[in-house]
Regions:
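Active-site-adjacent pocket scaffolds in enzyme catalytic domains
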Residues: 2-91
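C-terminal domain-boundary segment and adjacent tail
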Residues: 78-125
Length: 125
């Protein structure tokens, strides 16, 4: 699952996902900035503190979103590429998993976001 606009209410959202049988969530991110909202770049199981319960919901942290770079931070193509490079290098050094979010409009052939995405694919190999 991924919540639209990355809007989650912890623990309510996660409890509802568990109730519906969802096993993975990709909403743990900041909409307006890059970075790992939970401080981790590896998936982890949601632990319900209020109920002192281990769950089977795997939270997969999202490192960056196309809209963050383009709309919120107003980065140029080169600035976005530099940011992606730093993030991918950091995740590789930690042995983590780099997950990003790209909207379909970012894949227009002449889009700067498309070029950044292509660079990301090469960098992450």
């Amino acid at each position: 699952a991924r919540m639209h606009y990355l809007k989650i209410q912890i623990p309510h959202t996660y409890r509802e996902l568990i109730r519906m049988g969802v096993e993975f969530d990709f909403s743990m991110a900041y909409a307006g900035a890059p970075g790992f909202r939970a401080g981790l770049c590896s998936p982890f199981f949601f632990y319900d503190l209020a109920n002192e319960t281990e769950t089977n919901l795997s939270v997969v942290p999202l490192g960056i979103m196309d809209v963050s770079m383009k709309k919120y931070l107003k980065l140029s193509r080169n600035e976005s590429i530099a940011l992606v490079d730093r993030m991918v290098d950091t995740v590789k050094n930690c042995g983590g998993v780099f997950v990003s979010l790209w909207h379909n409009e970012s894949f227009a052939e002449d889009s700067d976001c498309n070029r950044v995405y292509e660079h990301l694919l090469e960098k992450a190999r």
